């Protein structure tokens, strides 16, 4: 049999085919809302009747008549009495009531016995235990469909924890599909029933304490509004809660003056606002409301009125199609007889085939008389009213408009003031020096303050900084509660936690985190043992005092041995005048006691000496000493570089394993921080041993703040376990601190938010934008670089300062002073022991100083001699020099009036020059020598040989 499809605007000619009453088609409507200022059901039925009767397509003169009966209360007796009044009128269908479940059940039973169609417009009750009559059709969406739609929304939002508030116990049966989904999954659904007082406040407090963010409310419109009012009083209507209403009159609730704009309130609607008659229908109800109920603003057409409107059209459409196949008629029925309507079954079959578009969307029924193939619109409350963000279709399931939902979330941050909980921690958040003179956010500075300014500029929100009360980041207590900033986020007392808050799995279970804005790890901070301060004589440090003493003894021993060996060996004795060719009886030894002491010094200083060893024995002593000094000097140079160019750090531990394997150095971390949680939950053996030590150590090795830990490191034998970022910050400002080993783990800092925060994605995108623009790195350099200590990565050799090698300058200055003093003593000693004194000692010293200052010629005649030289014998006439004499060195001596020195030199040269071809000055004895031919005993010819021919004094 083909499906029946008819538009509402077409009225066929079936109205003329009514047997018993050819001029009317009678329908009965039972209303349980007699008040004019209520749902407008009476008006909606009248509008449907008038619209059908005025349709130009209607053929014939038959018209639709709707008899309205009122129920004063939900009573089975009164309902049965009303039905007994309806049956004799010969109706083709009974509509309603909309809110009387007991009466609706009696009507269904009576209509089923008489085979008269019955249209329900109220939510179904006791679906599992109530027998559905064949003659009963329900235009209201089933609770099963609503249950599946709610489950789809929870899946879309990845909600794993929710709470269901039930106004009646039947809701557990009505929402069976929803409950079954939570039973087969690991998600948690808590159910709370309203008590007889109908006060939802205790239930809401329990939900708040349980930290449940998603609340499903299954109640009528009035109770749903009451629950929302109480939630607002408890501060539970905020951006961290999501409310889902199962009542289909969600769009009729007034919430603009009730809730925060950021709250996520979702509900369903079945109204088809695109229908051609919907605007006229709503305006008519609004006009009637204004005339009779002007004390309360009109919120919109009630669902029951729209369903009754569609029910009238569904009955008319089915009767039209039935009249095309057979002539039907109606006749009066009685409650006292067993007579039934003979065309009732046929009409029911045609009603199940009806397909039309009504005020509540697509109207179609399945074999059970339930509505099918329709869609529920999913609405979300915004500051501008309700907006559709998706729909749930019976056949197609859930389809959400992610773009609309995301854009709405972004709008929630605009011009919104967020409460930021934080903690005083350098350099993340610090009080300004003049914070007493300021108020609000201006009192603070630091990395987090600058980052908040950047985020607020991108996302266009306002914020208020508030310090956490207990001054900790957050750890779980034995009773399951959390302390610190994490606890404030869980209690919804703050919107953001911006600090050095580490992202951990344990915290992620109770709060949400943004993407990390900084990456770090746990490190070890320890004090640097610099040893004693380098002194002026630190150049002596490469050798121990014992080595220096043995070197001095070795020097004295070598000097004595050299002096002794040089005296014993005959090869160190030689003539001071080699020109005498053996005629001189005087022998000289160059290794006097002074020279023996000086020779090792020259070798030790690697400067050499004018004294050259002649004998094999002295050369042996010299070679051994030079080998000794080579090793000593090389070792000294190597150690000097290590001692003076690099300040060695005396650190007794080099890794975390060294720290765990000893007990002399105490170590700990911040109490209640992520580092403490890391060691507490670690399964690594070394970290477990460290946790056992820290947990059992008395007095406690845990500190309350980073500043306390730094002070403990500097003032005691203590190693502090903290994040690498803080380690770097304090090492930049105190050169006595150093990092031991590498990182123990890898983690990140993130912005904390309450679970289910609707703007987490927006903060994620903003943080990524700051990272791409390098703004976070710029802020880190701004607040981390202290500039007091050099970078540890710079391993270039450090230049030596006066504090390192100043002692050698002291030794040099002292040596120069001693040398000057000794020179003066020698000068005075010579003057005092000279036999002839021409001037005083002071005058002589002044003269010498003047010649030194004026840089005069260093060659001058001796002013003082130890003894008066004897007079020279007169030179014979034949040996007197000629007027001009030429020396072999090219110097000329004039014949006329020469000075005495030149005349004497010329005379001596003339004596030597007799019988010689050349003369010269001996380079050793500084006396004149002549080149004279002498017969050689080995050869017959003559040989030339230099021979000293005079005993004259050496030239000056």
Curated annotation (Swiss-Prot):
Region annotated Disordered sits at: 863-889, 931-956
Q: Which residue windows are transmembrane per the record?
A: 546-566, 624-644, 805-825
The record's keywords, sorted A to Z, are: Cell membrane, Cell projection, Glycoprotein, Ion channel, Ion transport, Ligand-gated ion channel, Membrane, Postsynaptic cell membrane, Receptor, Signal, Synapse, Transmembrane, Transmembrane helix, Transport
What would be an example GO MF term here? ligand-gated monoatomic ion channel activity involved in regulation of presynaptic membrane potential
Topological region Extracellular: 21-545, 645-804
CDD domains (UniProt xref): PBP1_iGluR_Kainate_KA1_2, PBP2_iGluR_kainate_KA1
- Membrane topology (Cytoplasmic): 567-623, 826-956
Q: Which SMART domains does the entry link to?
A: Lig_chan-Glu_bd (SM00918), PBPe (SM00079)
GO-annotated cellular components:
cell projection; hippocampal mossy fiber to CA3 synapse; kainate selective glutamate receptor complex; plasma membrane; postsynaptic density membrane; presynaptic membrane
Gene symbol here is: GRIK4
Q: Which residues form the signal peptide?
A: 1-20
Family annotation (InterPro entries): ANF_lig-bd_rcpt (IPR001828), Glu/Gly-bd (IPR019594), Iono_Glu_rcpt_met (IPR001508), Ionotropic_Glu_rcpt (IPR015683), Iontro_rcpt_C (IPR001320), Peripla_BP_I (IPR028082)
User: What is the membrane topology listed in the Swiss-Prot or TrEMBL record?
Assistant: Multi-pass membrane protein
Q: Where is the composition biased (Basic and acidic residues)?
A: 939-948
Indicate which residues the UniProt annotation says bind L-glutamate: 500, 502, 507, 674-675, 723
Just give the chief location class: membrane
Q: What is this protein called?
A: Glutamate receptor ionotropic, kainate 4
Tell me where it resides: Cell membrane; Postsynaptic cell membrane; Presynaptic cell membrane
According to the record, which residues are glycosylated? 158, 220, 272, 286, 323, 408, 415, 479, 736
């Amino acid at each position: 049999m083909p499906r029946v499809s008819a538009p509402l605007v077409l009225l066929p000619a079936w109205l003329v085919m009514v047997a018993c009453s050819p001029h009317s088609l009678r329908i009965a409507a039972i209303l349980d809302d007699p008040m004019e200022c209520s749902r407008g059901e009476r008006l909606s039925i009248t509008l449907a009747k008038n619209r059908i009767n005025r349709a130009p397509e209607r053929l014939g003169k038959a018209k639709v008549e709707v008899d309205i009966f009122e129920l004063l209360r939900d009573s089975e007796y009164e309902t049965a009495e009303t039905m007994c009044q309806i049956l004799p009128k010969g109706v083709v269908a009974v509509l309603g009531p909309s809110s009387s479940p007991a009466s609706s059940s009696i009507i269904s039973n009576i209509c089923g016995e008489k085979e008269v169609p019955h249209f329900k417009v109220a939510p179904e009750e006791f679906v599992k235990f109530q027998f559905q009559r064949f003659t009963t059709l329900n235009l209201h969406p089933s609770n099963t469909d609503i249950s599946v739609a709610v489950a789809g929304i929870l899946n879309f939002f990845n909600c794993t924890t929710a709470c269901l508030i039930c106004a009646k116990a039947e809701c557990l049966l009505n929402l069976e599909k929803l409950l079954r989904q939570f039973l087969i999954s690991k998600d948690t659904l808590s159910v709370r029933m309203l008590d007889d007082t109908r006060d939802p406040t205790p239930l809401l407090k329990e939900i708040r304490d349980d930290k449940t963010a998603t609340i499903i409310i299954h109640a009528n419109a009035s109770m749903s509004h009451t629950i929302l009012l109480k939630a607002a009083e408890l501060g539970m209507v905020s951006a961290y809660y999501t409310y889902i209403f199962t009542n289909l009159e969600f769009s009729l609730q007034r919430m603009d003056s009730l809730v925060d704009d950021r709250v996520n309130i979702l509900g369903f609607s079945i109204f088809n606002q695109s229908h051609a008659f919907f605007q006229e229908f709503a305006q008519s109800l609004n006009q009637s409301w204004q005339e009779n109920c002007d004390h309360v603003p009109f919120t919109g057409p009630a669902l029951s009125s729209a369903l009754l409107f569609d029910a009238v059209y569904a009955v008319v459409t089915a009767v039209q199609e039935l009249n095309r196949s057979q002539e039907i008629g109606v006749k009066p029925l009685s409650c006292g007889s067993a007579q039934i309507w003979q065309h009732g079954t046929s009409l029911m079959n045609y009603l199940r085939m009806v397909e039309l578009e009504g005020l509540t969307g697509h109207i179609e029924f399945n074999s059970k008389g339930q509505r099918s193939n329709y869609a529920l619109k999913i609405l979300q409350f915004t500051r501008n009213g309700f907006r559709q963000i998706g729909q749930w279709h019976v056949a197609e399931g859930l389809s959400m408009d992610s773009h609309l939902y995301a854009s709405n979330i972004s709008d929630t941050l605009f011009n919104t003031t967020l409460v930021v909980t934080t903690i005083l921690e350098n350099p993340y958040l610090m009080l300004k020096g003049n914070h007493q003179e300021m108020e609000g956010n201006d009192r603070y500075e630091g990395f987090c303050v600058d980052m908040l300014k950047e985020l607020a500029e991108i996302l266009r929100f306002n914020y208020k900084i508030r310090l956490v009360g207990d001054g900790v980041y957050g750890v779980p207590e034995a009773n399951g509660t959390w302390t610190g900033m994490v606890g404030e986020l869980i209690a919804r007392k703050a919107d953001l936690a911006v600090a050095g808050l580490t992202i951990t799995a344990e915290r992620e279970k109770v709060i949400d985190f943004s993407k990390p804005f900084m990456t770090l790890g746990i490190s070890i901070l320890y004090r640097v043992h610099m040893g004693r301060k380098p002194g002026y004589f630190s150049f002596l440090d490469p050798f121990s005092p014992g080595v220096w003493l043995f070197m001095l003894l070795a020097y004295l021993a070598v000097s004595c041995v050299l002096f002794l060996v040089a005296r014993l060996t005959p090869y160190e004795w030689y003539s001071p005048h080699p020109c005498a060719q053996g005629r001189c009886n005087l022998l000289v030894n160059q290794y006097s006691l002074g020279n023996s002491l000086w020779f090792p010094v020259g070798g030790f200083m690697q400067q050499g000496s004018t004294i050259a060893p002649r004998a094999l024995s002295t050369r042996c002593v010299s070679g051994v000493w030079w080998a000794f000094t080579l090793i000593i000097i090389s070792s000294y140079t190597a150690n000097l570089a290590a001692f003076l160019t690099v300040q060695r750090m005396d650190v007794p531990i080099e890794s975390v394993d060294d720290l765990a394997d000893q007990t002399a150095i105490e170590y700990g971390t911040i109490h209640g921080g992520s580092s403490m949680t890391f060691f507490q939950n670690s399964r690594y053996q070394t970290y477990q041993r460290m946790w056992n030590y820290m947990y059992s150590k008395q007095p406690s090795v845990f500190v309350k703040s980073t500043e306390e830990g730094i002070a403990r490191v500097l003032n005691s034998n203590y190693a502090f376990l903290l994040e690498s970022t803080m380690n770097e910050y304090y090492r930049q400002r105190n050169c006595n601190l150093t990092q031991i080993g590498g990182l123990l783990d890898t983690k990140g800092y993130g912005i904390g938010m309450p679970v289910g925060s609707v703007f987490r994605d927006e903060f994620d995108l903003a943080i990524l934008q700051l990272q791409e623009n390098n703004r976070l790195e710029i802020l880190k350099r701004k607040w981390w670089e202290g500039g007091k200590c050099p970078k540890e990565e710079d391993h270039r050799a450090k230049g030596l300062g006066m504090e390192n090698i100043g002692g050698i300058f002291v030794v040099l200055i002292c040596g120069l002073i001693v040398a000057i003093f000794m020179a003066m003593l020698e000068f005075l000693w010579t003057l005092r022991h000279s036999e002839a004194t021409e001037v005083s000692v002071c005058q002589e010293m002044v003269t010498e100083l003047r010649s030194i200052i004026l840089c005069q010629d260093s060659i001058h005649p001796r002013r003082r001699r130890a003894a008066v030289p004897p007079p020279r014998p007169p030179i014979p006439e034949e040996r007197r020099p000629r007027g001009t004499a030429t020396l072999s060195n090219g110097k000329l001596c004039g014949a006329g009036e020469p000075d005495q020195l030149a005349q004497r030199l010329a005379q001596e040269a003339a004596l030597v020059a007799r019988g010689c071809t050349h003369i010269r000055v001996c380079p050793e004895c500084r006396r004149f020598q002549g080149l004279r031919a002498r017969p050689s005993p080995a050869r017959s010819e003559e040989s030339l040989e230099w021979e000293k021919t005079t005993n004259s004094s050496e030239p000056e």
